[in-house]
Amino acid sequence: EDSYSNTVSLNAETTENLFNDLGYDLKSVRLGEKVKPIYLTKLPRDLNALGNTNKKRDLFIKIVLPLILNENQKIREDREKLFHILSKSFNTVGERVWLKRRFKEYKIDDRDLAKLKMRIDIIPVSIAIAQAANESGWGTSRFALEGNALFGQWTWSKKGISPKNKDPDKTHKVLQFQVLKASVRAYKN
């Protein structure tokens, strides 16, 4: 498990400067340049201070895009492994354990291979960015800033943040994550 105890918080301006210094810009990405593998653990708390809506949106996308692409790479690797395992007549104990873990991770009955094949599939990048932008207010919502919650997933039992002014009959919370990468990982499920 990754350790995030020694992370630092960057403000929006410092994050922008970091991306500029590394030559990471969306125009180049749109023209086919690879996305820089820069993985921030949390969003800048002062995204709204940028003032310019386009700058805020671009910075948000530059933060979230590498996280989504990284998760997609892991999903691709899992998908390759799944199809390799399924192509064999006999599976090793390790392969059976791996399959059992994927069934549990994706919350699928451990006999439904068809459903597992459908579920272990990449996250459509544009949809993930759009949902993260919508659910997190382009990274400015309380849930995003306090709990690294990009996608607004609800929970009734896990650690989460209670919505303010919620209906007293409602018992849900918004899932809270230690780092942004965990929010993206949970989104695939």
Where are these regions (language model features)?
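Catalytic cores of secreted/periplasmic lytic hydrolases that degrade extracellular macromolecules
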Residues: 1-130, 134-189
